[in-house]
Regions:
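Nucleotide/pyrophosphate-binding catalytic subdomain
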Residues: 1-149, 154, 317-319, 338
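Alpha-helical scaffold segments in soluble metabolic enzymes
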Residues: 11-14, 23-30, 96-100, 137-140, ...
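Short glycine/serine/threonine/alanine-rich loop segments
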Residues: 33, 103-104, 162, 228, ...
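Short, ordered loop/turn segments at secondary-structure junctions
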Residues: 40-43, 74-75, 110-121, 169-172, ...
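Structured helix-beta-strand junction loops
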Residues: 65-66, 160, 226, 298
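Short hydrophobic alpha-helical runs that function as membrane-insertion/retention elements
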Residues: 105-109, 164-166, 231-232
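A conserved active-site cap/scaffold subdomain adjacent to cofactor or substrate pockets
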Residues: 134-209
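A conserved regulatory-domain signal marking ACT and ACT-like small-molecule sensing domains
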Residues: 175-340
């Protein structure tokens, strides 16, 4: 059963994408658009090339100035796009298309705007659309499970210097958010308050850790073996805490291995949430103070705190019951007050 499932997923994805692209082409032609169906699904191809070769071969001879290519989101390739990228495969194809064709800009249509906060939680009248940000911030959002585009897709476009515009399909008059490589807000500000509540803290406490080279390396070896990526991390003299998604596969297996390997350590877990304050230009004294003060005034205890020297993301680890209150408090202090 496990042997044929990957191939079946690839086949089903290719059929669905080909059907959608073909119908879209016919609809556009009926409306006077010179649309051209470009089928990358490869269902008739005997040979399998790399994705770049597949795209280049199928686009060869097309004059983009006189026609509109309607391309399948699925592209047959040696590496198996569904197996490698799962449900984000269409954004990988999108990215490769942009790079191969030397696009001026890539536009992704979502069902939402990239906003300063969750409008359903904070209120549509209190949030604003983020007009411009950079790829660094897009990475931070992906870690919060809020990816505007698949991280592996954005990397290819970032390296090629191609900006991405995230537009709301239900608000066509709004230019949306432009994500470019080097943008930094002209004045210090917070761009977004966001977070995730599906976080598990894995704490390793061991008095023998003090001054012991490679201790953390051995902890991470188990994470790597079980393909578990961490979102945030705290350390002190005798404690290392990694914050991971509780939905991570092999989590129980990883915890069992840690307990077997570190006999003298106390290994514990705790369900937590992370709320992030993100911005391209926050290198100003006072942002952290204001954020911590806003949480304290809302009676929220900060369990842990992370911020790298580059100062684009402050992560507050809190109890899950405070998740929504924390976002409202931080948005009110760091975004809404700045707009007054």
């Amino acid at each position: 059963r496990e042997d044929y499932l990957p191939a079946a997923r690839e086949l089903l994805s290719s059929i669905g994408e080909a059907h959608s692209a073909f119908n879209s082409t016919l609809i556009l032609r009926e409306r006077g658009v010179n649309a051209v169906f470009v089928d990358l699904s490869g269902w008739r191809d005997q040979d399998t090339d790399s994705m770049e070769e597949t795209i280049s071969g199928h686009l060869a001879g097309l004059d983009f100035a006189s026609c509109m290519p309607i391309v399948t989101g699925y592209a047959k390739c040696k590496e198996g796009v569904m197996a490698k990228f799962d449900r984000g495969y269409s954004e990988i194809t999108f990215s490769k298309l942009a790079v191969v064709t030397g696009a001026r800009e890539g536009i992704i249509h979502k069902e939402f705007h990239l906003s300063t906060g969750d409008p359903k939680l904070i209120g549509a009248d209190k949030v604003r659309t983020i007009g411009h940000t950079n790829y660094d911030i897009a990475d931070q959002l992906a870690d919060m499970a809020m990816e505007a585009i698949h991280p592996k897709a954005s990397k290819a476009m970032e390296l090629a210097g191609i900006p991405i515009r995230v537009a709301n399909a239900f608000d066509p008059g709004n230019p949306g958010t432009l994500i470019s490589r080097d943008y930094v807000a002209p004045t210090p500000r917070v761009d977004m308050i966001c977070g995730r509540r599906d976080v598990l803290a894995i704490e390793v406490f061991d008095p023998e850790m003090v001054g012991e080279p490679g201790y953390d390396y051995n902890v991470l070896a188990s994470f790597a073996k079980n393909k578990i990526s961490y979102i945030a991390k705290n350390t002190n003299a005798n404690t290392i805490t990694h914050f991971v998604s509780e939905k991570s596969k092999n989590l129980d297996k990883c915890l069992k291995e840690l307990k077997e390997h570190f006999h003298g350590a106390q290994i514990s877990t705790r369900e937590v949430a992370i709320v992030s304050v993100i911005g391209t230009n926050m290198k100003l004294p006072g942002f952290l103070h204001r954020a911590a003060k806003a949480l304290a005034e809302s009676k929220i205890n900060v369990l842990a705190l992370d911020q790298c020297i580059r100062q684009v993301n402050m992560q507050f680890i809190i109890d899950r019951e405070d998740f929504e209150t924390a976002q409202k408090a931080l948005h009110r202090e760091l975004v809404e007050h700045e707009q007054i």
